[in-house]
A protein has these predicted regions:
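Residue-level signature of catalytic and energy-coupling elements of molecular machines
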Residues: 16, 22, 54, 73-75, ...
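P-loop NTPase switch module centered on the Walker A-proximal segment
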Residues: 1-100, 104-106, 144, 213
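Conserved P-loop NTPase nucleotide-binding/switch module
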Residues: 86-100, 105-149
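Short boundary/loop segments of OB/S1/cold-shock single-stranded nucleic-acid-binding domains
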Residues: 196-197, 209-217, 394
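Accessory interaction regions appended to the cores of large information-processing enzymes
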Residues: 160-162, 189-193, 197, 223-604
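Gly-rich Lys/Arg/Thr-decorated short loops/hinges at beta-loop-alpha junctions or inter-strand turns
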Residues: 40, 67-71, 91-97, 126, ...
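A contiguous, basic/glycine-rich beta-loop/short-helix subdomain that forms a polymer-engagement track
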Residues: 203, 215-220, 499
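Canonical P-loop GTPase G-domain recognition
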Residues: 123, 133-193
């Protein structure tokens, strides 16, 4: 197949703007999936966590055969926390499909990926989706998209982008809102006409950049990437050029292409093809698979540096080992090492203590996804509060800042502006939306946002929408206010007693219900005041042998707050840890015994 018959394109979309639905429809209508049974809903989200949260974490490839052309669609993570993934993906494609909701317009999360795509000189195609929705305003959204591109420094050619109006759910697209349409033909044709075929010479020496790494239990490590030049065959001897310019020889055992979403074995591939190669044991992302006789490296892709760091401890609570399968230092270390083989933007460092590791990533979500995956795999561990990575630039301390966008009902905007102001945020823009809500933009230190999401949802009665995105490093602003409330800490090991919890309810809100296993030093609730209170949730009612006059008081327990991983990580202070097991999320003090905590809090 000559490279003229291939189109490689990345799809960029905000959470819930209909990316996966659109890809499902493109697959169905092109007939690519005829050989497959019913398309499972949302075919592109393959990881259980992605389907559940509706976000894309790992980029995936889909191939669509349209007429005599193969269209490779690569999914991009919409979140800046996965910036490492994004940049490598965009290096494989020649155009981008930006999918925008006809009502919400371009969102901050897509801004990050779009800016990277424009900087690489890729030409965008804008698809305005959900035009059948009530309250949609496609024309205003096209204008907003144009303004976004202009603000991101797009060239005149990039600003002259084609616009396709679509309803992915109903399976139609059109170039003009007045037209009638019942299929996606005009979208296929726009991709064919606007996206250039991949450059590359099939007759030149082989060059292919390792874009993502995957693992298969049967064939081992799989390298995914686009063949930049030359050809690659099964059984061919190749050379890997590592980042330090050292070289290593391997033999290709299998080449896999994509048909729809399925990997299929192919005998060979040439310049322009996006493929998976097996048989290469040691290669890192960004390194080059090259011709054995004439190995020439491609430029290594620079990945954004981490901005947040956290400690992972081996779980040493009194309940350690009762709920998980993997609990030892070695098992945790092996799992973290496996993660950084494929998750390039993540760093893992050993610390002075044998059972504590330091992990650094692009944001709370980036690290949170790894912890949630480990929890589902059966790991037990404890993690510390996230801290930002502070840099010294020209002798001055600098910390990461994020651009924050909030959409709130007008009645809550004062509270939000005040709360974020206390956290070091500066307001940069305020506009009224058509539906009566207000969109406010801020620049805020990343530190100020840790722990803010749940407070924001409480302040806006669950109606507000908050997005934040790494912006740049800026001046360090000193101490920021911490949590307003203290916590209730258990003084005993045992099972919680309903009567004791009932008596403690007037002191604050509980994280635990009756008959739950507790231990000394475990945080069981939020104190209504700003100090920590050590309490006994295990004490039963004193019973006397003299019958009391009157009835027993009825015990009426308030439903406890359910802790999720994100909420717990946001909530804790520096002297606390989140204990994570496959069945439970608990909060505990670093030092479980009260006299140890008192000693640690005394000034030296």
């Amino acid at each position: 197949m000559s490279t003229r018959k291939i189109r490689n394109i990345a799809i960029i979309a905000h959470v819930d703007h209909g990316k996966t639905t659109l890809v499902d429809e493109l697959l169905k209508q092109s007939g690519t999936l005829e050989g497959r049974k019913e398309v499972s809903e949302r075919v592109m989200d393959s990881n259980a966590l992605e389907k559940e949260r509706g976000i894309t974490i790992l980029a995936k490839n889909t191939s669509i055969q349209y007429k005599d052309t193969l269209i490779n669609i690569v999914d991009t993570p919409g979140h800046a926390d996965f910036g490492g993934e994004v940049e490598r993906i965009l290096n494989m494609v020649d155009g981008v499909l930006l999918l925008v909701d006809a009502r919400e317009g371009p969102m901050p999360q897509t801004k990050f990926v779009t800016s990277k795509a424009l900087a690489l000189g890729l030409k965008p195609i804008v698809v305005i989706n959900k035009i059948d929705r009530e309250g949609s305003d496609p024309d205003a959204v096209v204008d907003a998209t144009f303004d976004l591109f202009a603000s991101l420094g797009a060239t005149d050619e990039q600003l002259d982008f084609p616009v396709v109006y679509a309803s992915a759910k109903n399976g139609y697209a059109k170039m003009d809102l007045a037209e009638e349409s019942d299929n996606l033909t005009c979208l296929y044709e726009t991709i064919m006409g606007s996206v250039n075929p991949p450059e590359g010479d099939p007759d030149a020496p082989l060059q292919m950049l390792a874009t993502t790494l995957d693992w298969d239990d049967f064939i081992g490590r799989i390298v995914v990437g686009r063949v930049a030049n030359g050809r690659i065959k099964t059984g061919q001897d190749i050379t890997v050029v590592h980042a330090d310019a050292s070289k290593e020889n391997f033999r290709v055992t299998k080449i896999l292409g994509f048909v729809g979403l399925t990997r299929v074995e192919v005998p060979e591939a040439e310049a322009g093809d996006i493929i998976s190669v097996a048989g290469i044991e040691t290669i890192n992302i960004g390194e080059t698979i090259a011709d054995k006789e004439n190995p020439i490296a491609l430029p290594i892709i620079h990945v954004d540096e981490p901005t947040l760091t956290m400690e992972i401890h081996v779980n040493n609570s009194p309940l350690a080992g009762t709920e998980g399968k993997f609990i030892t230092t070695r098992q945790i270390r092996d799992r973290l090492m496996k993660e950084i083989r494929t998750n390039v933007a993540m760093r893992v460092e050993e610390t002075d203590s044998a059972d504590i590791y330091k992990i650094s990533g692009r944001g709370e979500l980036h690290i949170g996804i790894l912890l949630e995956n480990m929890r589902r795999e059966g790991f037990e561990m404890a993690v510390s509060r996230p801290a930002v990575i502070v840099r010294e630039i020209d002798g001055k301390k600098q910390e990461p800042y994020e651009s924050v966008t909030v959409d709130v009902e007008s009645e809550y905007q004062g509270t939000v502006i005040e709360k974020l102001g206390k956290r070091g945020a500066e307001m940069t823009n305020l506009v009224s939306n058509a539906d009566g809500s207000t969109r406010i933009e801020f620049n805020c230190p990343t530190r100020g946002l840790i722990g803010y999401t749940s407070e924001f949802l409480t302040d806006t009665r669950g109606t507000g929408v908050l997005h934040h995105l790494f912006h740049a490093y800026g001046p360090y602003i000193g101490k920021l206010p911490g949590r307003n409330n203290g916590v209730l800490v258990s003084m005993e090991n045992g099972e919680s007693v309903a009567y004791a919890l009932w008596k403690l309810q007037e002191r604050g809100r509980m994280f635990v219900g009756a008959n739950e296993k507790l231990y000394e030093g475990m945080v069981i609730g939020i104190h209504s005041r700003d100090n920590d209170l050590v309490v006994n949730p295990i004490k039963g009612k004193k019973l006397s042998n003299v019958r009391a006059s009157g009835k027993d008081e009825s015990i009426d327990l308030v439903t406890p707050i359910k802790l999720t991983l994100e909420r717990a990580i946001e909530f804790i202070e520096d002297d606390e840890l989140v204990e994570i097991t496959p069945k439970s999320i608990r909060i505990r003090k670093r030092k479980l015994l009260e006299h140890e905590r008192k000693r640690a809090s005394r000034p030296d």
